[in-house]
Curated annotation (Swiss-Prot):
This is Thiamine metabolism regulatory protein THI3. One of its GO terms (biological process) is positive regulation of transcription by RNA polymerase II. One of five 2-oxo acid decarboxylases (PDC1, PDC5, PDC6, ARO10, and THI3) involved in amino acid catabolism. The enzyme catalyzes the decarboxylation of amino acids, which, in a first step, have been transaminated to the corresponding 2-oxo acids (alpha-keto-acids). In a third step, the resulting aldehydes are reduced to alcohols, collectively referred to as fusel oils or alcohols. Its main location: nucleus. It comes from Saccharomyces cerevisiae (strain ATCC 204508 / S288c). One of its GO terms (cellular component) is cytosol. Pfam families: TPP_enzyme_C, TPP_enzyme_M, TPP_enzyme_N. Keywords: Branched-chain amino acid catabolism, Decarboxylase, Lyase, Magnesium, Metal-binding, Nucleus, Thiamine pyrophosphate. Residues 578-598 are annotated as: Disordered. Present with 2140 molecules/cell in log phase SD medium. InterPro entries: DHS-like_NAD/FAD-binding_dom, PDC/IPDC-like, THDP-binding, Thiamin_PyroP_enz_cen_dom, Thiamin_PyroP_enz_TPP-bd_dom, TPP_enzyme_TPP-bd, TPP_PDC_IPDC, TPP_PYR_PDC_IPDC-like. GO terms for molecular function: branched-chain-2-oxoacid decarboxylase activity; magnesium ion binding; RNA polymerase II-specific DNA-binding transcription factor binding; thiamine pyrophosphate binding. Belongs to the TPP enzyme family. Pathway: Amino-acid degradation; Ehrlich pathway.
Length: 609
């Protein structure tokens, strides 16, 4: 007979609410907690060590901790962040806001002053000095799907369960304030023997039936269809349903930049990355001439709509958002898309399909190899690195050139992409890399036979300088990511897009990047500085380099005014937009026109490199 949870952990009849909280996270296989300690959070953190499977990451600052919880959540379904009242939570709020914008489930627990001090409105440290202890809670409410304070002894266990469920199901941050004098509120441990109910709410059967009928009708009639997979496919755990739908329909499949890594890019139906009007010609051709388009996990950001200068030509579109569906001109709110897709799959009859499958053209166009002594360029690097990726890789790309360059790659099967294309907080990926490393460590341990996911980070030198402290935490835990520092001597994307390319605010202080691992006390590492095509080829062809048995930092030396092709394409859209502004206002001087040093680059990249 299987023992109950309380028996396995030999729990007494009553436990503290803080113990209960950590046991609930343990039950969901959430084993790493991120954050920084503080006077108001330390009593809570003491309880963390009562649960054998949990560990405290101990981040370098709260912002990086929020980034790490976000990266962890993208693989595990939920990230937990603990900060102290006021100064700590405000340091983290940028990262939490990013999780809200990008639909990532975070449980943010804030250690608060005792309720007695709050009632008396004492002028405690970490307050604004006005006796208002609710101000930070109010600030958090705008970047959380739910907020609460653990103050009622009769309801506190229900509140803990509610917070975890909301963060898990809605994939948005939840704010939980816990005063220091409430940490030991007694709770019956027997509640832990009943698992959390994480079932999605059932759809209205009549509405669901109508939506399914209309979508299937379009599917059966369509002769030139397309499927576009967007960000919320991974956020709402729709990957398996999407995979089955693509396999059975055999429609042409595309991903948005935020959806990259959610479908099998080695499948013959995969056609590439859809970025609105700046998509590759072969992608535009399919989408523009489609008579029916399904967008799964829809998030209409500027990166998938060419800065909102693109609309689907066909009106026969099924836009499947996180919790609603737009079908032509009709909107159906309050729908679970996961349950809807499952019902569509259950009712799908492939014999009724009108579409005749055809293989999509390869997005990887063979290019002549430059000589080995040729200096590296973005365009060549991003095309070449695809050959080094392996199934199961976690590929993280920073806001900037890397976020555009990765769209030129083709991922192997079961590869996940992590980026922050919508919120775009520069420096996010160092913390996200830490969180992803913790997550894959736990996933590898839980799987049999064991897998060995590699975590690969591409980060510009400017972004690296913003959040470098978390490299110390990576070293502390002996984690083994690949960190590619794309050194183009400053903020090249901004330098390229803005009309003043020579402004000093693009520049940064040069660092000895490869010396930092030694500074942080690392002993198991490898560093490389790659300048030429030959050095790059030699590196990725080395079988030892392919094994993630140590932390590796690779500095890729690039020209300061060199950018990926996808960014050049975006510039064309920006130029047209600026031209329209100029026509509307002849006195306007803020026109994005490339300076002379970019003209040769435009011509060179347009013919390939």
């Amino acid at each position: 007979m299987n023992s109950s949870y309380t028996q396995r952990y030999a729990l007494p009849k009553c436990i503290a609410i803080s113990d209960y909280l950590f046991h609930r996270l343990n039950q969901l296989n959430i084993h790493t907690i991120f954050g920084l300690s503080g006077e108001f959070s330390m009593p809570l953190l003491d309880k963390l060590y009562n649960i054998p499977n949990l560990r405290w990451a101990g981040n370098s600052n709260e912002l990086n901790a929020a980034y790490a919880a976000d990266g962890y959540s993208r693989l595990k379904g939920l990230g937990c962040l603990i900060t102290t009242f006021g100064v700590g939570e405000l340091s983290a709020i940028n990262g939490v806001a990013g999780s809200y914008a990008e639909h990532v489930g975070i449980l943010h627990i804030v250690g608060m002053p005792p309720t007695s001090a709050q009632t008396k409105q004492l002028l405690l440290h970490h307050t604004l000095g006005n006796g208002d202890f609710t101000v930070f809670h109010r600030i958090a409410s705008d970047v959380a799907c739910y907020t609460t304070l653990i103050i009622d002894s009769e309801l506190c266990a229900d509140e803990v369960d509610k917070c975890i469920k909301k963060a898990w199901i809605e994939q948005r941050p939840v704010y939980m304030g816990m005063p220091v004098n409430q940490v030991n509120l007694p709770i019956e441990s027997a509640r832990l023997n009943t698992p959390l109910d994480l079932q999605l709410h059932k759809n209205d059967p009549d509405v669901e039936k109508e939506v399914i009928s209309r979508i299937l009708s379009f599917i059966y009639k369509s002769q030139n269809p397309a499927i576009i997979v967007d960000a919320c496919t991974s956020r709402q755990n729709l990957i398996e349903e999407t995979k089955e739908l693509c396999n059975r329909l055999k429609f042409p499949v595309f991903v948005t930049p935020m959806g990259k890594g959610t479908v099998n890019e080695t499948d013959p139906q995969f056609g590439g990355v859809f970025t609105g009007s700046i998509s590759a010609p072969e992608v535009r051709e399919v989408v523009d001439f489609a008579d029916f388009i399904i967008v799964i996990g829809c998030m209409l950001s500027e990166f998938s709509t060419s800065t909102f200068h693109f609309q689907y030509k066909t009106k026969n579109c099924a836009l499947l958002y996180s919790t609603s569906v737009k079908l032509k001109n009709a909107t159906y709110p309050d729908l679970s898309i996961k349950l809807l897709l499952q019902k569509i799959l259950a009712n799908l009859d492939e014999s009724k399909l009108s579409y005749q499958p055809s293989e999509q053209p390869s997005m990887m166009v063979p290019r002549p190899y430059p000589a080995g002594n040729v200096l590296l360029r973005q365009e060549w690097v991003w095309n070449e690195i695809s050959h080094w990726f392996q199934p199961g890789d976690i590929i993280i790309t920073e806001t900037g050139a890397s976020a555009f360059g990765v769209n030129q790659t083709r991922f192997p099967v079961n590869t996940l992409g992590i980026s922050q294309a919508l919120w775009g907080s520069v420096g996010y990926t160092m913390g996200a890399c830490l969180g992803a490393e913790f997550a894959v460590q736990e996933i590898n341990k839980d799987k049999f036979p064991a897998t060995k996911h590699r975590v690969i980070l591409f980060m510009g030198d400017g972004a690296f300088q913003l959040t470098v402290q978390e490299l110390s935490t990576i070293v502390k835990w002996g984690l083994t990511p690949y960190i590619f520092v794309m050194n183009n001597q400053g903020y090249s994307v901004d330098r390229f897009l803005h009309h003043r390319s020579d402004a000093s605010y693009y520049d940064i202080q040069p660092w000895n990047y490869l010396g930092l691992l030694r500074v942080f006390g690392c002993t198991n590492y490898e560093t490389k500085k790659i300048i030429t095509v030959g050095e790059f080829r030699s590196m990725i062809s080395d079988p030892n380099f392919a094994t993630n048995d140590k932390i590796r930092m690779i500095e890729i030396m690039l020209p300061p005014r060199d950018v990926p092709q996808a960014l050049l394409d975006r510039w064309v859209v920006e130029k047209e937009q600026s031209k329209q502004v100029q026509e509307e206002n002849e006195n306007s001087s803020a026109v994005n026109t490339p300076t002379p040093e970019f003209q040769p680059l435009l011509k060179k990249n347009q013919v390939g490199y």
